[in-house]
Regions:
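Beta-strand-enriched accessory nucleic-acid recognition/scaffold domains that flank the catalytic cores
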Residues: 1-544, 551, 557-887, 893-895, ...
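Flexible, glycine- and charge-enriched loops at secondary-structure boundaries
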Residues: 915
Length: 933
């Protein structure tokens, strides 16, 4: 169970139609008949039916379905029209802001009819739409593209032809289909994926300057190492040492730290990937000091043109792997000219958070540790068992599980209210939610989803080595990381880390030494929350990752690391040559064929399940797993390459023997399988979790929670409550029961719930002001009727409840950790009221080192991952002198250096600028509050 924040201003309502919405009258009649026959069969099965009757019904269903398919095939050349009855609220979904959304000038408040998502059930209808377009309300729509996620779920995007023609140059940076075809065409599915980049959820990069960018060749070397080489024709597996070509910057570029202190993914026309902060200006200056005979600022772009990085004030360096359609432009100057001419824009997505919370491991990563003992498994389950035991009795655990603590950077209004007013835990809605979350956690834990000491981090290559390659011309640079070292500041005290990545099919546990302490000077160059990998390591082949934004689960759990070291002692990377993707002319037929290839040949879930069967067996066939891993990657690339190796008969038999039977018992929890679909519980690692994960009875303990007063949620506690108000509450409860569930992905095209929330809020605000409606619902649902389910209420009106709490709660108060009484704090670190204070042992103030900037500071909370107050407050935007005993800041207004601080909250402005700011604020306050008389 996941609690989701609804951001109305970032979501745009559009229609999502399945292919039945485009049927002709004749096709619709057959479809209705087919649905009726299926309903009759279902009723007959429930009431009892003889085999001949069942066979007759099935035959009629098959005949009707075949007639429908034949009719659809006959209408391939038809320009279809959306049926009027399909234009209903249940077919409205929300999509996130993107470059495409911005160029189409869509609005978040009303239905946008310029873009439509099509869900494919019958390929014949999809073929007709892709080749011929369709009409809705007199407007013609044409096929646009489909993202990778949409392809997996058999969806694509269609756009109003007139609107698309108006913004197509802005989306493609002036590269028409005709010009691509003149250059020999392109791989169709790659083209669709690159075109769909503009449909990725992004925020506008407002100060992006294309003139400060260049594109250069990728950093590539040959890394020698031992591999298991697989011949894709014979399936022979040979262990040998060989040189493996690796593109270390595959999808990764650099950005100066003055523009961004954080890693993030970029989207621009034909450009995608990760941008990682690295001060290449400083690298060039130091290289010039080492070798004054050469100006190291010169670099050659992918078109052979030389650039002086400093004189041209280059701030962003893209790599060839990031610029997907580079070969169709004669120079980067042409791209830049078009970029400005057509007012193209860039977007940011997946920006690295300042604080990365601990993550959970999954069953794929556990099932490969086949030698794990019961004691080791129990140690790994300890954190999960502790959370389960405290979820109904410990206030801190309750708030953390509900996402109502400081670690959650993306709270919904329910979570914000709960963090501000923990007494709300006494409400029945919170109790039911906790009970459901406890049950969900138990199921997840038995499915292998366990709380561990691990975090998801961006994978970044050694960018210092990349600069040695680019600016110093060293073919095989040493870099800052040697051998198989990694570096991350998030685990400064961990000497070893287990670097993992999904999907995890073979034994991809890359246990690596963390050099944070051993090489302290590295933080002069590496200063993000990512994990940096050595360019002398085959880790990218072990984990099968690119550096275009892929993330790794970096685990510091000592038990997992020790088991992984033991288990993977003789494991080397798998290596096999992949097929190349062929180019083709872009035509409507080619676009449709490409979509069909992607829809019909991308089922990697079946192979994943087969591998799980092998790992759950008593004697896992690891060679069979290696072969299945290879086949899995060929299936992933099939839509682009249209190539899949043919399995030799001996291997076909061996794999069928290894994967024969039902799926493991834990699939009952991991995939929702029934008892008859799974094997009996075995001795596999994940199966043993059934007995290792502790199940506790839910006994809610309200001892330290305090008294809940519903009136705190109200703007005016004295509002009248009569027949009118009762009708409002009754109507809200009735409509809320039909809204659906909010527990879907915010990136899912099927999120009807959020449109329902928006429409419901709009409807009820017709009955009165926001404060009035909120107060009526609070009194009716919290006091008059004690409604147990209030998710829809908080999603609709949680913003006003939160504002009411801010106004009603006494300032500078908090709940006592021991008795739950709300008290006025006299110290920011005070957690206990006066009655309980003697029992509170104040912690000693100690010196800690900030993991972000290296500055020394005073704190009561000395732990790995400590962050100084300056970095917490200003996000390191103006921090300097990292590693010194004093933390030096610059004024955010004039840039003057500020005084160093030792303890407490630092200022961000010098006294002069702060004085000016104070006078300006006083003037604004006087204007705002002056008398009207």
């Amino acid at each position: 169970m996941v609690l989701i924040q609804v951001q109305f201003d970032k979501q745009y309502p559009v229609y999502a139609f399945d292919t039945a919405c485009f049927y002709t009258d004749e096709e619709t009649a057959l479809d209705h008949k087919l649905q009726e026959l299926r309903a009759n069969l279902s009723k007959a099965m429930e009431s009892g039916i003889t085999p001949p009757e069942k066979a007759a019904l099935n035959a009629e269903i098959k005949q009707t379905k075949e007639a429908l398919k034949q009719l659809i095939d006959q209408n391939i050349g038809l320009v279809r029209t959306v049926r009027k009855e399909a234009q209903r609220p249940s077919n409205i979904v929300q999509v996130f802001e993107s470059t495409l959304i911005r160029n189409l000038q869509m609005v978040p408040d009303d239905l946008n009819e310029c873009m439509i998502i099509v869900r494919v059930y019958y390929f014949g209808v999809a073929e007709s739409i892709i080749k011929n377009g369709f009409y809705m309300d007199g407007e013609k729509y044409v096929f646009f593209s489909a993202s990778a996620g949409q392809i997996r779920t058999k969806k694509f995007v269609a756009i109003q032809e007139s609107r698309l023609n108006a913004c197509m140059n802005a989306l493609t940076c002036g590269l028409p289909v005709e010009e691509i075809n003149e250059h020999g065409g392109v791989n169709i599915n790659k083209y669709l994926a690159y075109l769909a980049l503009c449909n990725s959820a992004t925020q506008l990069w407002k100060d992006f300057d294309i003139n400060r960018c260049i594109v250069i060749d990728d950093f590539e070397t040959v890394v020698n190492g031992m591999v298991d080489f697989i011949d894709e024709k014979t399936y022979d597996i040979t262990r040998k040492e060989m040189g493996v070509p690796i593109t270390h910057t595959d999808g990764c570029g650099m950005i100066l730290p003055i523009l961004s202190k954080k890693n993030f993914m970029v989207r621009a026309p034909w450009i995608k990937g990760l941008l990682s902060p690295f001060d290449f200006y400083k690298f060039i200056r130091e290289a010039n000091k080492r070798d004054p005979s050469k100006d190291h600022a010169w670099i050659t772009d992918i078109y052979g043109n030389k650039h002086h990085v400093i004189k041209e004030r280059i701030q962003i360096i893209f790599t060839k792997s990031q610029f997907k359609m580079w070969k169709y432009y004669d120079s980067f100057d042409t791209y830049k000219k078009n970029f400005k001419k057509y007012r193209c824009t860039a977007g940011k997505t997946n920006i690295e958070p300042s604080i990365i919370n601990k993550a959970t491991i999954n069953y794929q990563m556990l099932q490969t540790l086949t030698s794990m003992t019961d004691e080791e498994l129990s140690n790994i389950c300890a954190a999960t068992n502790r959370a389960l035991s405290r979820i109904s009795s410990d206030r801190t655990t309750m708030l953390r599980v509900l996402g109502a603590d400081s670690k959650n950077q993306n709270k919904g209004y329910f979570q914000k209210c709960l963090e501000l007013y923990p007494e709300m835990l006494q409400d029945e809605h919170c109790k039911i939610t906790l009970r459901e979350m406890k049950r969900s956690m138990e199921i997840d834990a038995r499915a292998g989803k366990l709380m561990i000491d691990g975090k998801y981090q961006f994978l970044i290559p050694d960018l210092y080595a990349a600069c040695q390659y680019w600016f110093e011309g060293i073919d095989t640079p040493e870099g800052l990381l040697s051998g198989n070292e990694v570096w991350t500041r998030l685990y400064p005290n961990a000497e070893q880390l287990d670097v993992l990545r999904s999907p995890h099919l073979y034994k991809e546990h890359a246990v690596r030494p963390n050099t944070y302490k051993a090489k302290p000077l590295i933080k002069k160059w590496f200063n993000t929350n990512g994990i940096y990998t050595s360019t002398h390591d085959l880790i990218s082949k072990i984990l099968q990752f690119d550096n275009d934004g892929d993330k790794s689960l970096v685990v510091a759990d000592s038990t997992i690391i020790s088991v992984a070291e033991r288990e993977c002692d003789d494991v080397v990377p798998l290596y096999y040559p992949m097929a190349k993707a062929a180019a083709a002319q872009i035509t409507p037929t080619a676009l449709y064929d490409g979509m069909v290839a992607a829809w019909t040949n991308g089922n990697i879930g079946a192979i994943s399940n087969q591998i799980s069967r092998i790992w759950a067996s008593n004697h896992p066939d690891t060679d069979a797993v290696k072969i299945l891993c290879m086949e899995n990657n060929f299936i992933i690339d099939y839509a682009k390459t249209l190539y899949q190796p043919t399995r030799p008969p001996k291997w076909d038999e061996r794999i069928r023997n290894a994967t024969n039977g039902k799926v493991p018992a834990f699939f009952k929890y991991a995939k929702g399988k029934f008892d008859h679909q799974v094997n009996p519980r075995g001795n596999g690692v994940v199966d043993r979790l059934f007995n290792t994960v502790q199940i506790y009875k839910f006994r809610f303990n309200s001892a330290a929670i305090g008294h809940f007063d519903y009136r705190m949620l109200m703007y005016d506690e004295n509002i009248p409550y009569g027949e009118k108000e009762e009708k409002i509450v009754s109507e809200f409860r009735r409509e809320a029961s039909h809204m659906g569930t909010p527990n879907v992905s915010m990136y899912d095209d099927n999120n009807h719930y959020f449109w329902n929330v928006k429409e419901m809020r709009k409807k009820f605000l017709q009955y009165g002001s926001l404060q009035y409606i909120t107060d009526v619902l609070v009194r009716g649902m919290f006091h008059e009727h004690h409604v147990s389910r209030k998710s829809a209420f908080f999603d609709c009106f949680g913003d006003q409840v939160y504002q009411n709490l801010l106004n009603n709660l006494p300032k500078k108060t908090r709940l006592c950790l021991r008795c739950g009484k709300r008290f006025i704090i006299s110290d920011p670190h005070q957690n206990y009221c006066k009655d309980c204070e003697p029992l509170d042992k104040p912690r000693e103030i100690k010196t800690a080192e900030c993991v972000l900037c290296g500055a020394k500071f005073k704190t009561r909370n000395v732990e790995s991952g400590s962050i100084c107050p300056a970095c917490k407050m200003i996000g390191r935007e103006h921090t300097q002198c990292a590693g010194k005993k004093e933390h030096v800041l610059n004024c955010v207004d004039c840039g003057a250096p500020l005084d160093a601080y030792v303890f407490g909250r630092p200022s961000t402005r010098c006294p002069h600028c702060q004085s000016i700011r104070n006078k300006r604020n006083v003037k604004k306050w006087k204007i705002k509050h002056r008398s009207n008389t």
